[in-house]
């Protein structure tokens, strides 16, 4: 009576991955790095803050150099000038590797989204920064489902229409 049977609505797989200042391993950083390293076609990211680990930053650059469509969407202006300056320090190398850098213009983009190959969607509370991976208590959902990934891809593309792409030659 108090615990009715849950109805199964889908066969899709959802994995919850936490992070925080506990334990030996940084599960969320490892899961994101593994997903990025195993991408074959597409890695699209929305994050308000981009202060990644060296491993994740390198994995994204290697993916772009290998011909994978890597897009990083950031707010044109975040809520912190210091964080903007720190985030921007990574972008020239990213662009030189072939990562498309997109600045969202209408307002402060606070979305945390990672789409891999139209098969994996990662959403949750974690930014793509070392604080979320190592210091803050965060949780992301890894959704292994093509339909969800395609829906998120359409949302990303809608947001991209509100962006300006930055190029290395006019960045400096």
Q: Residues of each region from the PLM?
A:
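Charged, low-complexity intrinsically disordered terminal segments
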Residues: 1-172
């Amino acid at each position: 009576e108090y615990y009715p049977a849950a109805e199964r609505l889908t066969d899709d797989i959802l994995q919850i991955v936490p992070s925080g200042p506990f334990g030996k391993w940084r599960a969320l950083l490892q899961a994101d790095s593994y997903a990025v390293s195993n991408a074959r076609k597409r890695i699209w990211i929305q994050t308000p803050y981009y202060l990644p680990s060296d491993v994740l930053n390198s994995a994204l650059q290697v993916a772009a150099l290998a011909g994978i469509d890597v897009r990083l969407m950031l707010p044109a202006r975040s809520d912190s000038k210091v964080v903007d300056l720190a985030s921007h320090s990574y972008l020239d190398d990213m662009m030189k590797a072939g990562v498309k850098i997109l600045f969202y213009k209408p307002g402060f983009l606070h979305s945390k989204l990672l789409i891999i190959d139209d098969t994996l969607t990662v959403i949750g509370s974690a930014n793509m920064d070392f604080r979320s991976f190592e210091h803050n208590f965060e949780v992301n959902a890894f959704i292994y489902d093509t339909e969800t990934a395609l829906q998120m891809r359409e949302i990303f593309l809608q947001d991209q229409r509100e962006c300006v792409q930055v190029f290395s030659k006019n960045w400096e």
